Amino acid sequence: MIPGFFLSSKTSTINITNNQTKIELPFKEKKAKKELKKIENLLTNPKVVAIGEVGIDRHIYQKTKYPDYKIEEEFVELQKIFLIEQIKLAIKYNKSLILHNREAKKDMLGLLESVWDKKLEGRTVFHCCEPDFGLFEFAKKHKMFIGVDGDITYYKEKQEFIKTIPLEMLVFETDSPFLNPEPLRKKERGTNNEPKNIKIIAEYIASLLHCSTDSLSKQATENARKLFNL
């Protein structure tokens, strides 16, 4: 699965992929209203299986490409407006949905309750899910998946959280190029995370849950196939 980040990279990403590759379309550009139609056009490509990651973010980033970046309520409301439009596109084109939520649980759950559609059941994931039982209960109720990334190897709260999640709800992610898992995080500080590191994440979770890596990987793979309708 190859995620895109900005629309400028979408077409080239589609062009370089082979028949075994599927693509996720994100929607993170601040001035994005004019891009909605472009995204809708890309959704007609069969290689595109998901919209994401998309969502609501209240985190104050130290570094950003936007010089005027501020977390103000007007900006949060704008994020909500465009998230709703993207959810509608996922429903309309029967695509999976990869949700980004950072420090915005109340906003996210309220919005999802207002627009939820049965078509999203089994086709939606909380990407890099925060260790929050409110998110877990919503995901369980609506047959969503919980995404687990490299930070599970050093984030103690997530380690305890993941022990409570049924295996049939878990999918493994790398969040490449971010969130290098340990021990790479310390040994290779400053280097990009890569998809191949999914193995490290799977092995760590298996040790955490006291099960075999093979059985856990098979379950997570089956979950991913269901999520992305592969």
Feature locations, PLM:
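Mid-domain alpha/beta scaffold segments of enzyme catalytic cores
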Residues: M1-L230
